[in-house]
Amino acid sequence: FNGGFMATHGAYGAMSGGIEALPAKEGYATIAIGADGAVRIGEWGTDLNADGGPYAAWRQNARLITQNGAVNERVYTGTAATWGSSINGDVVTWRSALGIDENNEVLYFVAGPSLSMPALAEALTAVSAHNSLLLDINESWVHFAAIRYADGAPVAEPLLPEGMDTTVDRYLRQSSRDFFYVMAQE
C-alpha cells in the first residue's frame, strides 16, 4: 500500500535499513517497524523515539489521526497545511490511513474517495484503530494491491477496482514513490 506525502510536502522523517532520508520530527505521526518485524504507530518523541529501537524502518506523515483510542483534536481544526488537499485545494478527496489496534497486533488500511479528515477519523475509530496516521491522498496516490501468483508470475489486484486501477502493478517494480508491503510469515 501507498506511503505518505513526498518530502517536498512536509519534509517528514524517514529511515530504512539504517539510512536516514530525513530526520524525525518531534510530535509527528510515525510508523516504526522494529528489527524484529513488530509494527508500532505513535507520536515521535512521546510514543516512539530513537532510543526505542532498533528499527528496521520508520516513516512519518502529518499528525496522528487517532491517539490512544481518541480522535486527535487537530482532525477538526487542522487546515490543508496540516492534512493536505487536492491540487484544486479541496480537503475532501481520496485519502488513506494506517491504524493499529491497542495491542499492536492488527493493522488497518483505510481508504476511499471523498473523505474529509473527520470522516477518515470516524472510519478509523469504527475499526478500533488505537493509533493511526495519514498516508497519501488524492486518487493517483491512494492505492492498495494484493499480490497473488498465476503461472509463476506475480499479479497485482487492487483493493478497490474503481479508483485504484491506475498502474495496478506499481509495487512490483522500482518506484520513485515510497510504499509498504506486508508478508505472511510461514
Q: What are these language model-derived features?
A:
Residues 1-186:
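Gly/Ser/Thr/Pro-rich low-complexity, intrinsically disordered segments
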